[in-house]
């Protein structure tokens, strides 16, 4: 059993390798097996024809590093631990594994996917539905902030897959609206984030209600001790798929910084950028909800059309704003880290960090929004004297060099 950590403590990715080495160097080294087979194309993976149609229709051409390694073992029914960040195509990895194994003639819940936020759960639901379009999959997202009665009605009518947040999923199981008898796959997405948000007990409670023989997939950017503990309690001889941090991170995304003497001058720099660049769609990250509102007002007063979203807005408003952004009717979205993980817009070509993130891990969650799945993307970081330390930490953490923004930036977009 991995040592459990103090409640509410946070761990970063740098501890992952050390922790794994320590665990694998002990008598428990039989616990994990590494899975090293790599498939260069989706066609080579032995997937159903109609699943392949969904994958290609969604816009995938070549599998990403995590997909090349991760789809097949999941399809084989193995318990899988994948260390993978946002922007690497991991959602499509486990969605493909789930869709390949469903019995479509049985309209009962056969797969349960848990995610830490409503936005992420809804995003997974969209990907699952899109990839399973030609298979006739029935998917439902059970998340807080929506009608309990509506959830009960849909679950009663029958679905193949439920995606949701731990609180609402546990509620549906407790009310017996979600029947666990046929569930054969259980996926924890962003396990580190769920644990840091205090969902550990609920995840354990849900697991107790599931059938004993069940396939488990754990996806996590980092592996804090609590996540390792979960893998030990829930999993049976899991295969461990690790894509090295520098291999999966920022491939295909050009990163730059702009030196700004004072915090107050960031706004001028930002407006200059928007006046010189032809941008399809972009996301601007700031660190506080208050700053989202402030920056939105400032940009609108200068005739820039922008949308804004943050955690203080109700779910319905956030959904409408995200729909507008996805459809392209709004081209600039200002937001905070909280929602970084739920944004998946294929056309985003530019991410601007108006504020650098407070944790190096979040840098990837943010800039992974541009250059999704091998597309070209650009990230621009606005840096004052106070930000220099964090910029240095980010470069060290991801083993990258972030260069000063060149004069010909327009040619890069």
Curated annotation (Swiss-Prot):
GO terms for molecular function: ATP binding; ATP hydrolysis activity; RNA binding; RNA helicase activity; translation initiation factor activity. The keyword Ribosomal protein does not apply. A motif (Q motif) lies at residues 40-68. eIF4F is a multi-subunit complex, the composition of which varies with external and internal environmental conditions. It is composed of at least EIF4A, EIF4E and EIF4G. Residues 252-413 form the Helicase C-terminal domain. Keywords: ATP-binding, Helicase, Hydrolase, Initiation factor, Nucleotide-binding, Protein biosynthesis, RNA-binding. Residues 71-241 form the Helicase ATP-binding domain. A motif (DEAD box) lies at residues 189-192. Coiled coil: none annotated. InterPro entries: DEAD/DEAH_box_helicase_dom, Helicase_ATP-bd, Helicase_C-like, P-loop_NTPase, RNA-helicase_DEAD-box_CS, RNA_helicase_DEAD_Q_motif. ATP binds at residues 84-91. Belongs to the DEAD box helicase family. eIF4A subfamily. It catalyses: ATP + H2O = ADP + phosphate + H(+). Signal peptide: none annotated. This is Eukaryotic initiation factor 4A-2. Its EC number is 3.6.4.13. It comes from Nicotiana plumbaginifolia. Gene3D superfamilies: P-loop containing nucleotide triphosphate hydrolases. The keyword Iron does not apply. The lineage of its organism: Eukaryota, Viridiplantae, Streptophyta, Embryophyta, Tracheophyta. ATP-dependent RNA helicase which is a subunit of the eIF4F complex involved in cap recognition and is required for mRNA binding to ribosome. In the current model of translation initiation, eIF4A unwinds RNA secondary structures in the 5'-UTR of mRNAs which is necessary to allow efficient binding of the small ribosomal subunit, and subsequent scanning for the initiator codon.
């Amino acid at each position: 059993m991995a040592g459990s950590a103090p409640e509410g403590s946070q761990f970063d990715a740098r501890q992952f390798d050390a922790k794994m080495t320590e665990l694998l160097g002990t008598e428990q080294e039989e616990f994990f097996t590494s899975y090293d087979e790599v498939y260069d194309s989706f066609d080579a993976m032995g997937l159903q024809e109609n699943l392949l149609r969904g994958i290609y229709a969604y816009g995938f051409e070549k599998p990403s590093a995590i997909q090349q390694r991760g789809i097949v073992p999941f399809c084989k029914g193995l318990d899988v631990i994948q260390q993978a960040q946002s922007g690497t195509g991991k959602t499509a990895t486990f969605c493909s594994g789930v869709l390949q194994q469903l019995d479509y003639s049985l309209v009962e819940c056969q797969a349960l996917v848990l995610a830490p936020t409503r936005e992420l759960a809804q995003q997974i639901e969209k990907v699952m539905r899109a990839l399973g379009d030609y298979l006739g999959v029935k998917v439902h997202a059970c998340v807080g902030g929506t009608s309990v009665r509506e959830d009960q009605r849909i679950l009663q009518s029958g679905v193949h897959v439920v995606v949701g947040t731990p609180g609402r999923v546990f509620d549906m199981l407790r009310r017996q609206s979600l029947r666990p008898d046929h569930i054969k796959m259980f996926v924890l997405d962003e396990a580190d984030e769920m644990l840091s948000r205090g969902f550990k007990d609920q995840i354990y409670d849900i697991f107790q209600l599931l059938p004993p023989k069940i396939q488990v997939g754990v996806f996590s950017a980092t592996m804090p001790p609590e996540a390792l503990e979960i893998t030990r309690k829930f999993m049976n001889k899991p295969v461990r798929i690790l894509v090295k941090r520098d291999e999966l991170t920022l491939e295909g995304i050009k990163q730059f910084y702009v030196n700004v003497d004072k915090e107050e001058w960031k706004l001028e720099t930002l407006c200059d950028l928007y006046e010189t660049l032809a941008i399809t769609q972009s996301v601007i990250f700031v660190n506080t909800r208050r700053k989202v509102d402030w920056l939105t007002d400032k940009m609108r007063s200068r005739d820039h059309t922008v949308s804004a979203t943050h955690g203080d807005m109700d779910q319905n408003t956030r959904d409408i704003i995200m729909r507008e952004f996805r459809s392209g009717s709004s081209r600039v979205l200002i937001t905070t880290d909280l929602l970084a993980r739920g944004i998946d817009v294929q056309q985003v070509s530019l991410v601007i960090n108006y504020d650098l993130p407070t944790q190096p891990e979040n840098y990837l969650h943010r800039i992974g929004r541009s250059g999704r799945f091998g597309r070209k993307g650009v990230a621009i970081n606005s840096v004052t004297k106070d930000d220099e330390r964090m910029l240095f930490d980010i470069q060290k953490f991801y083993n990258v060099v972030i260069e000063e923004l060149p004069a010909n930036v327009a040619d890069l977009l």
